């Protein structure tokens, strides 16, 4: 039942939109939603998780790289005083044709982002519940203080009347003492009520980040509710939309996918590689021209390459089998969360 409470509270808040009290409550919640650091952190974590989907997808897309080199060589003694300037540039393209681990990593990140999104929704529900609770605690504290103050005035009048009657000899001193004790008690109750109100206001400030000089009271006369559905129908609807159960199911799916990812460690990979490059080398020095063995000619070359890269893991010391077992144990643990 505790898991269903945030959803029921959220449904209740959505039904108050036509009431002036609900408008104020919704305004308070909107301020809490914008200023609450825990919810902002949860939103940032959710956005980061969805951004990681792009990172997980990137290895499946073409990888293009540009490289360039420059080398200057100054020769002396055995190098016959030959100087050289060499420049080269290359463009490399790599495209994954088959690599199941990369596809699996993308699926895992999508599921992880889904879990983070549910976590954010859960934090939203928690904030709704906390805001509504703090809001109504303030209203309740105001009512208690008002009642205590009214009670204090009534008891004070009773004390005044009893004192006057004692002065004319109509009652005993014990009646005055009893009335005084009641008045002292209600004074203490008033102090307690004021402290409770201050605490309730401070609790609301901690949630929303603002102090509110006035909060709208409940409009009981205009309060209307729809005809309630059968309890079983409400329970089924709440269980269907329960975020804790949804998060547990997504965690189970994630654990199941991690088993497949571990099993993919036995599969081969195939990549397409292509490159084009040019190089230019020039020589200078006193002996660049001379005997046949010491003649150096400038060169300018270009080269294109296309190839396939295939890899098949055969044995990795039992690591893959261990990873599969570990993932299976994690799946059992995630499944137990649904029980």
State where each predicted segment sits.
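Sec-dependent N-terminal signal peptides
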Residues: 4-12
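Periplasmic alpha-helical coiled-coil/stalk elements that build and connect Gram-negative outer-membrane
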Residues: 3, 126-241
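Bacterial Sec-pathway N-terminal export signals of envelope proteins
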Residues: 8, 20-69, 104, 211-256, ...
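Small/polar-residue-enriched beta-strand and adjacent coil segments characteristic
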Residues: 63-76, 80-123, 246-258, 266-339
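Extended amphipathic coiled-coil alpha-helical segments
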Residues: 41-59, 103-136, 140-164, 181, ...
């Amino acid at each position: 039942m505790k898991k269903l409470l945030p959803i029921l509270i959220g449904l209740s808040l959505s039904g108050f939109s036509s009431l002036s009290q609900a408008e104020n409550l919704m305004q308070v919640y909107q301020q809490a939603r914008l200023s609450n650091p825990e919810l902002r952190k949860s939103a940032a974590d959710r956005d980061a998780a969805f951004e990681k989907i792009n990172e997980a997808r990137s290895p499946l897309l073409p990888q293009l790289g540009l490289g360039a080199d420059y080398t200057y060589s100054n020769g002396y003694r055995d190098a016959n005083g030959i100087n050289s300037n060499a420049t080269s540039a290359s463009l490399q393209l790599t495209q994954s044709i088959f690599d199941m681990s990369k596809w699996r990593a993308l699926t895992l990140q999508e599921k992880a982002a889904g879990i983070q999104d549910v976590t954010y929704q859960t934090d939203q529900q928690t904030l709704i519940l906390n805001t509504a609770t703090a809001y109504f605690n303030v209203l309740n504290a105001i009512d208690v203080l008002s009642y205590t103050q009214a009670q204090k005035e009534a008891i004070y009048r009773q004390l005044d009347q009893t004192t006057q009657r004692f002065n004319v000899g109509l009652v005993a001193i014990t009646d005055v003492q009893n009335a005084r004790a009641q008045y002292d008690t209600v004074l203490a109750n008033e102090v307690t009520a004021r402290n409770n109100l201050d605490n309730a206001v401070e609790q609301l400030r901690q949630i929303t980040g603002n102090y509110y000089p006035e909060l709208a009271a409940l409009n009981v006369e205009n309060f209307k509710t729809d005809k309630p559905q059968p309890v079983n129908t409400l329970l089924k609807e709440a269980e269907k939309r329960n975020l804790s159960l949804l998060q547990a199911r997504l965690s189970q799916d994630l654990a199941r996918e991690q088993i497949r990812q571990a099993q993919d460690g036995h599969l081969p990979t195939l990549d397409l590689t292509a490159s084009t490059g040019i190089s230019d080398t020039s020589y200078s020095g006193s002996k660049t021209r001379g005997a046949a063995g010491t003649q150096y000619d400038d060169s300018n070359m270009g080269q294109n390459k296309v190839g396939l890269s295939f890899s098949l893991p055969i044995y990795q010391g039992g690591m893959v089998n261990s990873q599969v077992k570990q993932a299976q144990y994690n799946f059992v643990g995630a499944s137990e969360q649904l029980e």
